[in-house]
A protein has these predicted regions:
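A beta-strand edge to alpha-helix "cap/lid" segment located at domain peripheries
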Residues: 1-29, 36-130
């Protein structure tokens, strides 16, 4: 059980490194076909929309990392809750947006055919303690 949790945590680290590099080939491998990402303002992105942000060059990171990582296994599913720190730039038809943020991230992994994939994630701004 501990080995599986470590595999998921390592995959989370590999995902973060791929986000930093804009490595769409690796991201395409690990994102589940029906992946859904929920952004910090509530918008949703499909797998292809998530990948296209890197493929078009719209999103470029200078720094991207995870810490405060906690992973729990539930059979063939795993939930990772962590802090995601990101610095970079996003550009689209609406303009240029500088990124320098920290989010609480919830990553949902599923095991399919003995391989773990990222099925979904949700980002929430860290605004302070309640």
């Amino acid at each position: 059980m501990q080995d599986e949790a470590q595999r998921v945590m390592t995959l989370g680290e590999d995902w973060a490194a791929a986000e930093l590099r804009g490595d769409t080939a690796f991201l395409r491998e690990i994102l589940a076909d029906d992946f859904v990402g929920v952004g910090p303002r509530g918008f949703t992105l499909t797998r292809e929309q998530w990948l296209s942000r890197h493929g078009t060059g719209s999103l470029r990171y200078e720094a991207f990392g995870l810490d405060e990582v906690q992973t729990r296994l539930f059979g063939d599913a795993a939930i990772t809750v962590c802090r995601q720190s990101a610095r970079g730039v996003y550009e689209d038809e609406n303009g240029r947006f500088d990124l320098d943020d920290q989010f609480r991230a919830t990553l949902v992994f599923v095991k399919q055919d003995e391989s773990w994939q990222l099925a979904g994630l949700q980002l929430s701004p860290i605004l302070g303690r309640p």
